[in-house]
Amino acid sequence: ALKEAVKRQTTMDIQPFFTEEEKKQFFSKYKQLLRHLYSFLKKEDLSKMKELMKRVVALDCYGRDKNGINGLLRNIDTAMIATTEIGLKRTSVIALLLYRPVMKKIITLDEVKTTFDADVTLIISRLLKTSDLYARNTAVDSENFHKLLFSFAEDVRVILIMIADRLCLMRLGKQLKNDEARKRLATEVSYLYAPLAHRLGLYTIKSELEDLSLKYTDRKQYDFIKQKLNETKRSRDAYIAEFITPIKSKLEEAGLRFDIKGRTKSIHSINNKLKKQNIPFEDICDLFAIRI
C-alpha cells in the first residue's frame, strides 16, 4: 500500500514528490529500515506505522524543503542513522518518523498517544518545541540559544534525534542550493552538534560532523589534507599493522580479552594541528592513533 502511495506521488506534474532515481532509493532504504525495525518493534507497532506512513505519503506530508531535498527520504535516512549508528530504539524512532506529520497537522498528538503511547507523544512535543525555537532564533551560535535548546529538549533522546538529523543533512550537503546555506549549516554543526556528539560519546559521528564542516567551510584545505592522506595511506597502514603486532602478541600471552584498532586521525584534527603548530603536512608525526 505504501508503494502504491509513492507511485501516485511520482505522477505529480510540478516538482514531483519522487524522481525516478529517488523512487528507487526509497524502496531500497525503506526495506533496510524495516529490517532494522523488525529487531525491536512489535508486529502491532509495525502495522500501525505502515498504515500511518501510507496515509501521510498520500497527503504529500513530506514534500520537499526549501533546498529541494525530499522530506521522506531525509526522514528515512535520519531514522537509519538513529537506529544503526546511535542505537535509538522504539519510542525515539516512532517519534522521529511521525514528528513531521504532527507538525503539519496531518496527525494529532492525541492520535499518536492513542495509537502508540504517551512517551512517543512526549518526544514529538519536545521536538516541536525545539523546531519552534529554531524558527524564532537566528543566532544559533549564541550561548543563550544553547541553553534554551537544552531546556526545550529536556530529554537526551530529543538531542540524539537532532544529532542524527544534522548528520543526515550534512551528508546531503551537496544538495543544498548554495555555498552560503552549506556554510551556515556547517557553522551550526561545528559549534553545537559536534561538541554535543563528543559529550555523548558519539566519537565517530563527532569526527564525521567536523570533517564535513571543514569540507563546506574550507574546501581547498579539506581536499589538500585528504589528498595527502591518500598519498601516504599504503605506508601508513603498513606502519600501523607493524606497530600493533607486538602489542597484540603481549596481550594474547597475558590471556586478556581485548580489541585493538589503528585509525588515521580525522581531517579536522589534522587541520587543527597544521594551524596550531604552523608546520607543513610532512612534519606531522602523529597521523594515526591506536585504541585498545
Q: Residue spans of the language-model regions?
A:
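Short, mixed-charge amphipathic alpha-helical segments
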Residues: 36-50, 109-119
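Short alpha-helical catalytic segment bearing the HExxH-like zincin motif
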Residues: 92-97, 162
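Hydrophobic or amphipathic alpha-helical targeting/insertion segments
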Residues: 97-126, 202
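Aromatic/histidine-rich interaction motifs
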Residues: 129
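Nucleic-acid processing machinery
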Residues: 3-41, 51-65, 74-85, 89, ...
